[in-house]
């Protein structure tokens, strides 16, 4: 049995990850953190898990060592505390954007600032198993690809392997949940339901 813990578990990504892991035969979820919900039952943030687990959220300071640590933090937070996280588990899977790009110069181009810890970026395997399975299996650190990049890559990879692509136009339609559970006028479902709006059409960082 693989003992896993989740950091940043009160958001949509953390909640869905927890749901998948709770029903995985090879994993046992030991801890899940949320500063906002610390001490409260997981179902207070994720009502769909009310009868699935008795876990309660804990703080980062309460985290104990585990086999695999899964990080679901906002952009920039993983790299800030990477030394702390790496001391807790020999294997880390990061669902944020902090280590997706293996080239610090490419990171600076897309994110508009230098990478805070450039010596680490090459240590992460790119986490799309359908195209990078062997590297992921051998890695101790994995950076999961973004949602738009995953959809685009999986759609185009078979064509690219056969050299059938001359040019590409990708038109992504994202629902209101893609913006996460932090409220804003742009992400408020009644405001955006049934509407189509362009969002950073030329320089969206999740293209990478």
Q: What is each model feature region?
A:
Residues 1-201:
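N-terminal Rossmann-like NAD(P) cofactor-binding subdomain of oxidoreductases
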């Amino acid at each position: 049995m693989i003992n896993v813990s989740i950091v940043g578990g009160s958001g949509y990504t953390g909640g869905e990850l927890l749901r998948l892991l709770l029903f995985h035969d090879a994993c046992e979820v030991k801890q899940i953190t949320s500063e906002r919900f610390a001490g409260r039952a997981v179902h207070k943030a994720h009502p769909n898990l009310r009868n699935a687990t008795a876990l309660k959220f804990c703080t980062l300071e309460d985290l104990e060592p585990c086999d695999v640590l899964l990080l679901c933090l906002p952009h920039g937070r993983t790299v800030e505390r990477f030394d702390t996280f790496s001391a807790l588990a020999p294997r880390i899977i990061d669902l944020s954007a902090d280590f997706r790009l293996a080239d610090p110069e490419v990171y600076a181009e897309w994110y508009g600032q230098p990478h805070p810890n450039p010596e680490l970026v090459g240590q992460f395997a790119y986490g799309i198993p359908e195209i990078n399975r062997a590297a992921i299996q051998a890695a101790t650190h994995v950076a999961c690809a973004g949602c738009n990049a995953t959809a685009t890559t999986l759609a185009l990879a078979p064509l690219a392997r056969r050299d059938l692509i001359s040019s590409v136009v990708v038109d992504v339609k994202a629902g209101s949940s893609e913006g996460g559970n932090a409220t804003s006028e742009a992400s408020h479902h009644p405001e955006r339901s049934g509407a189509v709006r362009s969002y950073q059409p030329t320089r969206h960082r999740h293209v990478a």
